[in-house]
Design a protein with these regions (language model features):
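Conserved beta-strand elements of the Class I
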Residues: 10-11, 170
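NAD(P)-binding Rossmann-fold cofactor-contacting core
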Residues: 28-53
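A structural signal for isolated positions on well-ordered beta-strands in alpha/beta enzyme cores
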Residues: 11, 35-37, 60
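Glycine-rich Rossmann-fold phosphate-binding loop(s) that bind the pyrophosphate
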Residues: 14-16
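Adenosine-phosphate binding glycine-rich loop
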Residues: 104-192
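Rossmann-like adenosine-cofactor binding region
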Residues: 56-143
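Short helix-loop-beta connector
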Residues: 2-9, 32, 92-93
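N-terminal Rossmann-fold NAD(P) dinucleotide-binding loop
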Residues: 19-20
Length: 192
């Protein structure tokens, strides 16, 4: 729905339990065609993810976040960061980003310029993402920007509201809605 079907490289930024779940879910949906990379502030925690997940997929630890982000087709952020980790200049056309870590006020993983650069900006729940999430930083200076955001449910019901071509940058800001998680899982499994 949002990532290109020909995506080859997936970068996971973060090393907690959720990193493992994200890797497992991408393997389940997209198969083993992806080369996974994991980056974390602590290399030993990234190594732990690699050791555990190498039983499931092809995965490596990376130390150069910028180089890995520049090369990634899909980026998943799942950290507790309060400052941007992924900068706008690092993201190439066609990249999809799922931002999961900014699930509370004050958290931020993406540079605001990157969110501004997105061709498609999707929220699991707009009002919640405006309160806390990557979108909260995006609308902070201009509330009219809310009109450019679509809810994930709208994309699930009408895929044309998601990615329309392979050069678009798409961002999904996921702050956590349980009912949405269930609907997404079912829809993705049905469509892939």
């Amino acid at each position: 729905l949002l990532a290109r079907r020909d995506s080859k490289r997936l970068l996971v930024i973060g090393t907690g339990r959720q990193a493992r779940y994200q890797i497992e879910s991408h393997v389940a949906v997209m198969g083993l065609n992806l080369q996974f990379q994991v980056w974390g502030r602590l290399s030993e925690r990234a190594d732990s993810v690699v050791n555990e997940m190498s039983k499931v997929c092809s995965i490596e630890r990376v130390d150069d976040l910028e180089a890995s982000a520049r090369d990634a087709d899909i980026i998943v952020t799942i950290t507790g960061s309060t400052a941007p980790l992924v900068l706008s200049d690092w993201v190439k056309p066609g990249t999809h980003i799922t931002a999961v870590g900014a699930d509370a006020p004050g958290k931020q993983e993406l540079e605001v310029a990157l969110v501004e650069k997105a061709d498609v900006l999707v929220a699991d729940h707009i009002e919640q993402c405006v309160d806390h999430g990557e979108i909260s930083h995006f609308v902070q200076t201009d509330d009219t920007r809310k009109s450019t955001i679509v809810e994930l449910g709208q994309v699930l019901n009408n895929p044309k509201m998601g990615r329309r071509n392979d050069s678009q940058i798409t961002i999904a800001d996921q702050t956590g809605i349980a009912a949405c998680d269930i609907a997404i899982s079912q829809s993705v499994l049905n469509s892939w």
